[in-house]
Amino acid sequence: MFVSTYAGAVAGIDAVKVTVEVNLTGGGLGLYLVGLPDNAVKESEQRIRAAFENTGRKMSGRKVVVNLDLRKEGAGFDLPIAVGILAAMSEVSGELLPTTMFAGELSLDGTLRPVRGVLPLAVKARDEGLRRLVVPAENAAEAAVVE
């Protein structure tokens, strides 16, 4: 099953919208990140696997390919990747994904950690016509500055 979500990448004081594509198949095993991720994004694989296991979710028996459409850096892609995987697994509804941007780092126990650059991400989400920006609670006040 194919699903796409949105994330954002901060460059200076600006942000760009990043499409996160997730494809889930029954054959093969593993989580593969493609699309020029940096080391922090590549490490998302281990954080996401641990978060899934520690919250009772299983990816075993499935091949998950995640494509990021621009060169990316930072751990803020954990949440959009995890949401995309959950939607592809039909664990969460994908209904709101086309109008939502996600940003957040996952800890190994599945809780969200704050990320940097939420203000430019909120501006970008608004400018792109997205209706929601989902961020960790610690980033909510910063994101709420943008209407």
Q: Where are the language model's segments positioned?
A:
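Peripheral, non-AAA+ core regions of ATP-driven protein-machinery
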Residues: 1-147
